[in-house]
């Protein structure tokens, strides 16, 4: 793990080795930070957050909704509690969607009409980026210039719109990719198709254009550098958070009673979207080798999983384990916490995972996790301390790992691991995440303003005079 650069508020940035598994960090990338002193004076008053393909109000575990949706909503709520307004732009997906939803004081969601409400696949959304961008720009145009201080785009589709908004509004663009096409394509599950070249091109453009890039882990920082040639000095590592008021240890007996589960049954939970990428089939196939183990699957079909929405149910029947597999729909946070407390362990066998929020939420409830050693999961789970990491997706290996962890959980070691899991998860608070987000925003605003001052406004003034956008600065690899 790379060293974490830490600004202690004095303007001097010291480097230290990170504590393994600590919460949100303020890494500036492998090349180190700039020497500029960024302060609270660069805090934004209002953030325009862009989420083209999925609403932060969508139920995680359905459609394309998952950890990214939780991240957007929770970070917006916590920024608002610090006096920073957040306006979230997302595509309307139903005629009943109101134009504006006031979620909480300081947080509102703008549902932008762009294309048909239903039946539009995520891979068709690039055809509606112009319509979405028009809706975003029109919303800003009713205000005086300078209404938004910064744009934060989530996922590459939003980055395409954010790039335009940045140029039009003359404010910095911060971008969070959440996933990268090249990473997903390198670890495809059976039944999954590769991400299209269009996405790879679009991601490269956004990486080149963004003023700052936010990634979930140091590993993701290395990926965006190696795959897209990102400038390390423009990267900030910000770990997602967990709601520690909801996800906390509790009474397992009470949780099992609420779900109608026997107290002495061995229970493994899988929570997530039902699609090959998340690999729920691995859990079922492993369970077939472990008599007496009950599997609870909570989530709905998504992505390529929509082609066979009942595929997992049929697989359980084919494996002869239907009687000990319980399928639940996507759960609210409160019900999800109950499920985590009821389980002996939670399985996260994904082929690709930029972080793995479910793993941290489960550990916050004191439940150990068995997870694939991919992406951000080695950060989310401390191997041998709060759970077990499995290399690869061989079913026998997963069955052995689950069986071993279940045996540990049944003895004194299980109590030690449960306490360690809760302590580890506590380092991933949304307060820590918000601190790191604000640090990134300050850098973006401070560096952006410093660059404008350095140029003396001459280039911008000249461009405005000839009818160009208020801000236009081509980056490497992006033509005029």
Curated annotation (Swiss-Prot):
Disordered, as annotated region = 1-42
Where does the source fall among the domains of life?
A: Bacteria
Record flagged with keyword Glycosyltransferase: yes
Residues annotated as binding 1D-myo-inositol 3-phosphate: 53, 64-69, 122, 155, 179, 199
Gene Ontology cellular-component annotations: cytosol
Per the record's keyword annotation, is Methyltransferase included, yes or no?
no
- Gene disruption: observed consequences: Increased intracellular levels of ergothioneine, 8-fold increase in reactive oxygen species-producing cells, decreased resistance to the antibiotics rifampicin, isoniazid, bedaquiline and clofazimine. Increased oxygen consumption and extracellular acidification rates, which are further increased by membrane uncoupler CCCP, indicative of electron chain dysfunction in the absence of MSH. Absence leads to alteration of transcript levels for 139 genes which probably compensate for loss of redox control. Loss of induction of some pH-inducible genes at pH 4.5, including the redox-sensor whiB3.
Which InterPro entries does the annotation name?
Answer: Glyco_trans_1, Glyco_trans_4-like_N, Mycothiol_biosynthesis_MshA
**Keywords from the UniProt entry:** Glycosyltransferase, Magnesium, Metal-binding, Transferase
One of this protein's GO BP terms? mycothiol biosynthetic process
PANTHER family referenced in this protein's UniProt entry, alphabetically? D-INOSITOL 3-PHOSPHATE GLYCOSYLTRANSFERASE, GLYCOSYLTRANSFERASE
Q: Which family does it belong to?
A: Belongs to the glycosyltransferase group 1 family. MshA subfamily.
User: What does this protein do, in the record's words?
Assistant: Catalyzes the transfer of an N-acetyl-glucosamine moiety to 1D-myo-inositol 3-phosphate to produce 1D-myo-inositol 2-acetamido-2-deoxy-glucopyranoside 3-phosphate in the mycothiol (MSH) biosynthesis pathway. MSH and WhiB3 are probably part of a regulatory circuit that mediates gene expression upon acid stress (like that found in host macrophage phagosomes).
Describe the protein's quaternary organization and the partners it interacts with.
Homodimer.
**Protein name (database record):** D-inositol 3-phosphate glycosyltransferase
What species does this protein belong to?
Mycobacterium tuberculosis (strain ATCC 25618 / H37Rv)
- Higher taxonomy: Bacteria, Bacillati, Actinomycetota, Actinomycetes, Mycobacteriales
The gene name on file is mshA
